[in-house]
């Protein structure tokens, strides 16, 4: 049986104003024994920026900045620079993040040569409304869940809401000469191929969405994926294929449970699935993975309280020997680490 070890929390919120409410969902980059974490820092106003920490070895935090590394600057990100992912391809680091303006959640990116200075390049996901997207979905002959999510968000937030396209990560090598980018339009995981980021215009996306069914890597299909799935860690190139650690969401009435899972994709054609876990890789089981409501002074949780949100949200990995360390957001508040033997995980995936 595949063994996953939970190694505990490595980052908690602090008293610094920019991260009093959360330090979680880190992008991870490994250089030998050095691990760089670019984490989502959340303040009391529920606005996010990017914090920075450095580890020596998989668990030992040796440096943590007391100010944001990347802050909110533009109107499209005025309420949040959230949930970063990072990939090095060639001589450039590509840094992706969810840009939130208080209503719309889109994906933007920045580039860096040294991981010290970042140049923001703007929004890359479709800037079309759900209303417009639904018409394009019809051409793609998508399942009902795509239309259900569109209706839900239009009713809850407004008809002018821009299509939410999140959970973006980049393959560390080009596939057949093209960039390969994983993204998530609810409820599945999709992939897009392109030659240059400048191609990602509204016209490009409209044509892509008309054919979206051709670019779905994974559909939500198992019991622990009942609501949706989404990418987590950037794809890892292995001898057997591309390993993708992703998140799953089970919805039980008003409660949501976020878990981690894994899939192995073909090296030359990542649309081809070699193997996929039929049970979670790991689930929220610890107290620090359960999101509790904020209570006023003197108040306690009622004895019949059940959590509305329990979360493990994998966002980055590091490899030491045969041990794969998985860094994840716990309870939308803190950063924790789990580990698994990489070869054993690959063998398990090849069995499925």
Spans of features found by a protein language model:
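Beta-rich carbohydrate-recognition and catalytic domains
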Residues: 1-21, 25-79, 88-227, 236-308, ...
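Short, conserved clusters of charged catalytic residues that mark active-site
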Residues: 230
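Extended, compositionally biased non-globular segments
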Residues: 312-317
């Amino acid at each position: 049986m595949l063994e996953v070890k939970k190694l505990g929390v490595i980052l908690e919120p602090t008293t610094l104003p920019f991260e009093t409410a959360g330090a979680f969902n880190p992008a991870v980059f490994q250089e030998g024994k050095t691990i760089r974490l670019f984490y989502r820092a959340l303040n009391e106003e529920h606005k996010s920026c990017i914090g920075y920490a450095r580890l020596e070895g998989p668990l030992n935090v040796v440096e943590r900045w007391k100010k944001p590394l990347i802050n909110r600057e533009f109107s499209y990100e005025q309420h949040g620079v959230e949930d970063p992912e990072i990939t090095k391809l060639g001589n450039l680091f590509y840094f992706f993040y969810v840009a939130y303006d208080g209503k719309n959640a889109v994906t933007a990116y920045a580039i860096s040569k040294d991981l010290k200075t970042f140049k923001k390049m703007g929004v890359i996901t479709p800037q079309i409304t759900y209303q417009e997207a639904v018409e394009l979905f019809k051409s793609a002959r998508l399942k009902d869940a795509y239309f259900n999510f569109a209706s839900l968000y239009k009713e809850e937030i407004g008809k002018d809401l821009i299509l939410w396209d999140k959970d973006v990560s980049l393959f560390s090598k080009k596939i057949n000469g093209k960039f390969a980018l994983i993204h998530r339009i609810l409820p599945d995981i999709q992939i897009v191929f392109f030659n240059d980021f400048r191609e990602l215009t509204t016209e490009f996306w409209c044509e892509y969405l008309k054919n979206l069914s051709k670019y779905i890597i994974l559909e939500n299909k198992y019991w622990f994926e009942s609501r949706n799935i989404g990418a987590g860690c950037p794809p890892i190139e292995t001898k057997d294929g591309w390993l993708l650690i992703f998140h799953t969401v089970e919805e039980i009435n008003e409660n949501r449970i976020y878990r981690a899972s894994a899939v192995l994709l073909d090296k030359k054609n990542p649309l081809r699935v070699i193997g996929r876990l039929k049970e979670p890789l790991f689930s929220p089981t610890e107290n620090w993975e359960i999101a509790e409501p904020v209570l006023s002074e003197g108040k306690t949780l009622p004895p019949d309280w059940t959590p509305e949100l329990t979360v493990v949200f994998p966002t980055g990995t590091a490899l030491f020997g045969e041990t794969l360390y998985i860094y994840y957001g716990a309870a939308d508040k803190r950063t924790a680490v789990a580990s698994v033997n990489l070869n054993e995980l690959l063998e398990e995936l090849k069995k499925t």
